[in-house]
Amino acid sequence: MSQYSGKIIFYEGKCFTGRKLEVFGDCDNFQDKGFMNRVNSIRVETGAWICYDHPDFKGQQYILERGEYPDFHRWNGHNDHMGSCKPVRMHGERYRLELFEGCNFTGQCMEFCEDCPFLQGRGWNKNCVNACKVYGDGAWVLYEEPNYRGRMYIVERGDYRSFNDWQSQSANIQSVRRVVNYF
């Protein structure tokens, strides 16, 4: 198994019932695999995954790590829509994230190597993040609310000059955490 693969199983019914779809890598459209976009439970056997409520890796993002999710509330879903998924691109276990107040890496900057449940509690002056840089090996999840709540966005190694680069509608970020439960 390569460092970017894993196994995730989607079920149409709650508690792992009904038709299922097993995925081992990028899947840009569940319907192309003969599976409807209704997902009510998920089992992640290996890897960490980014799931989207629309095909082509669009829409609301959900970060799922190894474990069982017997209904969509367990992955913070608002409904049973799921259209695409891909494994998190991780390279190892060194984590480093820089957050920037302004677009294009301007304004206040703060570095993180550990999870942070409330950015303002660490000295971040605002509740917005307009840009970030991900260094090292690991991936991070950015949350719109404190304590790892609200909409979530995955950022992998690279530069994100604007919140649009991580597919957000706004710069509102209040907590961050590392994706650590990979295998």
Swiss-Prot record:
Keywords: Eye lens protein, Repeat. GO terms for molecular function: structural constituent of eye lens. Coiled coil: none annotated. It comes from the Eukaryota. The keyword Lyase does not apply. Residues 6-46, 47-89, 95-136, 138-180 form the Beta/gamma crystallin 'Greek key' domain. Crystallins are the dominant structural components of the vertebrate eye lens. Has a two-domain beta-structure, folded into four very similar Greek key motifs. PANTHER family: BETA/GAMMA CRYSTALLIN (PTHR11818), GAMMA-CRYSTALLIN N (PTHR11818:SF22). Monomer. Belongs to the beta/gamma-crystallin family. This is Gamma-crystallin N. It comes from Xenopus tropicalis (Western clawed frog). The gene is crygn.
